[in-house]
């Protein structure tokens, strides 16, 4: 028995919506409490001092201050903090 898909069908005809991930506020920028600093999948960058982490791993400011990106800790991880 011959196996052939119905004419006109395709497996590739779709595209996902953009997710707008990435850094929203850069190092040295002044931010207010609640400002989103970084949207990401997983914790590529970890929250430091005065930074919170949402359920989708979005990092946001807990206090007003200046954004600071740095590397540190025992595992040499990337962090973002807010300097008041």
From Swiss-Prot:
<keyword id="KW-0689">Ribosomal protein</keyword>
<dbReference type="Pfam" id="PF01016">
    <property type="entry name" value="Ribosomal_L27"/>
</dbReference>
<dbReference type="GO" id="GO:0022625">
    <property type="term" value="C:cytosolic large ribosomal subunit"/>
</dbReference>
<comment type="similarity">
    <text>Belongs to the bacterial ribosomal protein bL27 family.</text>
</comment>
<dbReference type="GO" id="GO:0003735">
    <property type="term" value="F:structural constituent of ribosome"/>
</dbReference>
<dbReference type="InterPro" id="IPR018261">
    <property type="entry name" value="Ribosomal_bL27_CS"/>
</dbReference>
<protein>
    <recommendedName>
        <fullName>Large ribosomal subunit protein bL27</fullName>
    </recommendedName>
</protein>
<dbReference type="InterPro" id="IPR001684">
    <property type="entry name" value="Ribosomal_bL27"/>
</dbReference>
<dbReference type="GO" id="GO:0006412">
    <property type="term" value="P:translation"/>
</dbReference>
<feature type="region of interest" description="Disordered">
    <location>
        <begin position="1"/>
        <end position="20"/>
    </location>
</feature>
<keyword id="KW-0687">Ribonucleoprotein</keyword>
